[in-house]
Amino acid sequence: MGPEDDPFGYPITGAKGLVIASVHEDAEGEVYFLYQSSRYYPVNYTATRASFPYRAMGEVRGYGEGRVYVVWAEEIEQPEPGVACSKDDGLDIFSDWMTSVEDGFLTVHYETWWGDGSVKHRFGLVQGDTPYEVVLQHDTCGDRALEKADGLVCFDVNAFLPDTEGETVTLTLKWTTSAGKPAEREFGFRSRE
């Protein structure tokens, strides 16, 4: 589904025309996107976690629900947390709205060196020194460093981390930068109910 597939003239909404959301089913089995505690019911798409621009199909209800037309969607790579990489090649993480913890998912907007595009990079997320500390690992799998480009990866950390029992705790993400230096960033995390 690409940007050219939009048959409507509604304006694209969301931060910079794009949001990152989890895909769920409600009690009636209808698919919805959960984004910042709001439910958006797509009229044309289903997946597990995706980035997408959308067009509102009328008013968003006062309690954060509304029908949306998904202009296009791209599923985000979702490796299993707790699996380590055999190597840890550096990468840089953007401090932007896409790098976030929401709905039990850690989503990382990163930049790294890429070769010709035929080599798939691997990502691992392992437990750090404390219960709410995780370490992101990146393996280029021998890909040649020709140019820098960005990407998205997400991890369902809800079952990987201890239950916060309704409290918001500090989640620390650690990684190695492309310059080989250690880095970290903190997020508010609350277990998905």
What are the residue ranges of the model-derived segments?
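Bacterial Sec-dependent N-terminal signal peptides
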Residues: 1-18
